[in-house]
């Protein structure tokens, strides 16, 4: 058996974390890693104590026909990146890497996944250095967070997701 490379190893863990997700549209799993230690994990789901969409059987954004990338304030879920960030001390996130995996409701990999504008802001402020996103079974893209700072998509009409 061939040993799994480290990036896909961490992406596999993020994919397992994603299985806890409770969104009816898409679920994501995030892990934050620094110096080969997992600092925090997060998945898509309602805030603690609130009912999840899978328990309610409906998605408000879907019932209102809101397209992907718009009106996230109407969503019941906290995004996986946000869940992971709020569960970790900032000093442990500075210079860390986020590993992100997303799947749609049919269980297909979201190949063009990216963090939303709010999560990008949180990632920047947390001091995270890189975001690695699974694009296929063994493939991924690497984003240097500094690129999000230098190429501020909030100043254009490009939403980035």
Where are these regions (language model features)?
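Zinc-dependent deaminase catalytic domain
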Residues: 1-161
